[in-house]
Amino acid sequence: MNQSAEIICVGTELLLGEILNSNAQFLAQQLAQLGIPHYYQTVVGDNPVRLKKAVAIACERSRLLIFTGGLGPTPDDLTTETLADFFDLPLVEHPEILADITRKYAHRGRTITANNRKQALLPLGAAILPNPTGTAPGMIWHPRPSLTVLTFPGVPSEMQCMWQETAIPYLRAQGWGQEMIYSQVLRFWGIAESALAERVAPFLELASPTVAPYASHGEARLRISVRAANETEALEQIQPIATQIHQLTGLDCYGSDEDSLASVLGKLLHSRQETLSVAESCTGGGLGQMLTAIPGSSAYFWGGVISYDNQVKISLLGVDPDTLTRVGAVSAAVAEQMALGVRSRLETTWGLSITGIAGPGGGTETKPVGLVYIGLAGPAGVEHYECRFSDFRGRDWIRHLSACTALDYLRRKLLTLG
């Protein structure tokens, strides 16, 4: 039998696509980091017959079975009793679970009902996997020799807490994942995944650390991964590769791991003691939202104007009506005047603007959907950048790319200034 893990997510709502299966994504990432092999994922509806079939298949090919969902008090929550039935072991009530559920309900000003008692039932021999934030406990169980079963509730926040606090220490103590996989993700903007892969081609051939390109949310990324006994050992192998890639890719690499364009730009502005204001048209506040999502951004981001209507561009930003008549709102000239206007009105170091056609309508042969102008006004004057985004992924995609590109445009400007 393979020394591998398998993820089985239970819930008809997952099969119907009503809920995103974020639990499987989280667990897959966690298993990879722990160095635990993982080759299969299964989604099963709230049906005991089909769940038993999935368990039978999993038992033939995996040693660690991880279940999410089906631990609640309602009739369609069948994971625990189905597993007990499959392995032909009785359910046993745990008074400590019932007491914990009663206490949590009382804290919320509620009393438990009869169906809550089923959450206190676990198969004979199973240990409680505590749920600090919810009422549905999981279990750690060895129903057969060399087989480990872990169950978690389907609520992602509860499952993740239980995994971090109890499951990981348990698995490590049992000898799972003695060598973990450590990774660093380098993040790029303004370069396609294919172009990035070509530029760093020699690194993609490395056996250890491995370097793999992928794309996410419009940006290209490189994951540098290595199997190591500890983080210090891993960094000693990863960092030289990351440094070489940084040198090779220059300004296209904007950060790593949890960095975002907004957070990186914020650090630059804060270190320079400079401030920013924004004027937005087609992004409708999306640029400001990205900036204010960063804690402490009020130190450098002073505010913005959503000038969706031309009259707002004129009255609040000082855009010339003749310019609007002559070249239209989606133009380099208007983008520059918007940036100048918001910088002057809010008295900031930099003014950043966006005007464009996000679609799906409104495009013409000369100004198609996806045409966007970014304006940037600063101490030395004003400039603009023209973007032509593909519209095949729709309006929200164009708005997202526009806001990110504006952040990147100012980031590159600041780094060029030194």
UniProtKB/Swiss-Prot annotation:
Can you tell which superkingdom this protein's organism belongs to?
Bacteria
Q: Which InterPro entries does this UniProt record tie to the protein?
A: CinA, CinA-like_C, CinA_C, CinA_KH, Competence-induced_CinA, MoaB/Mog-like_dom_sf, MoaB/Mog_dom
What NCBIfam families does UniProt report for this protein, alphabetically?
cinA_nterm (TIGR00200), PncC_domain (TIGR00199), PRK00549.1 (NF001813)
Q: Which PANTHER family match?
A: NICOTINAMIDE-NUCLEOTIDE AMIDOHYDROLASE PNCC, NMN AMIDOHYDROLASE-LIKE PROTEIN YFAY
Family, as annotated = Belongs to the CinA family.
Q: What is this protein called?
A: CinA-like protein
Lineage, top ranks: Bacteria, Bacillati, Cyanobacteriota, Cyanophyceae, Gomontiellales
